[in-house]
Amino acid sequence: MSRRNISKKRFPETDAIYNSYLVSLLISRILKSGKKTIAKKIVYQAFDIIKKKTNEDPLTVFEKAIRNASPIVEVKARRVGGSTYQVPVEVTGFRATNLSLRWIIRYGDQRVGRSMAIKLANEIIDTANDIGNTIKKKEETHKMAEANKAFAHFRY
């Protein structure tokens, strides 16, 4: 194990409009080829669409979607005695947030629609209402962990 100092966890700065670091995490996940202004435009347009469709604060809808999509347990591959086991492991808070953001963006992008802003807004709204592909992915992850509960003693 390294004797060097442990690096500190760095959080991105909060975004300008909503003053939320979750929104800035979303912007940085949508980012492609370093084009941050386009990513910001997509996110803010999606939030405007959410506001029009739900008549609620888009930040609260987004936070609710993140909470609904965050997994509690996941499986990790662990090699023991020549065979690999899927070991259920609890998910930390930061990783749960990252996974939910990743899933929301992935399944939003896979939706049928014209612009990424519309697709992202619809996925966030569906996730906040506990429906959609993101919630299916979370439930699938939980089912995998439940099915492999017998290997929990291999946890590391």
Curated annotation (Swiss-Prot):
It is found in: Plastid, Chloroplast. Pfam families: Ribosomal_S7. GO terms for biological process: translation. Keywords: Chloroplast, Plastid, Ribonucleoprotein, Ribosomal protein, RNA-binding, rRNA-binding. One of its GO terms (cellular component) is chloroplast. Transmembrane segments: none annotated. Its main location: plastid. One of its GO terms (molecular function) is structural constituent of ribosome. Disulfide bonds: none annotated. CDD domains: uS7_Chloroplast. It comes from the Eukaryota. SUPFAM superfamilies: Ribosomal protein S7. One of the primary rRNA binding proteins, it binds directly to 16S rRNA where it nucleates assembly of the head domain of the 30S subunit. NCBIfam families: rpsG_bact. PANTHER family: RIBOSOMAL PROTEIN S7 (PTHR11205). Belongs to the universal ribosomal protein uS7 family. Part of the 30S ribosomal subunit. This is Small ribosomal subunit protein uS7c. It comes from Phaeodactylum tricornutum (strain CCAP 1055/1).
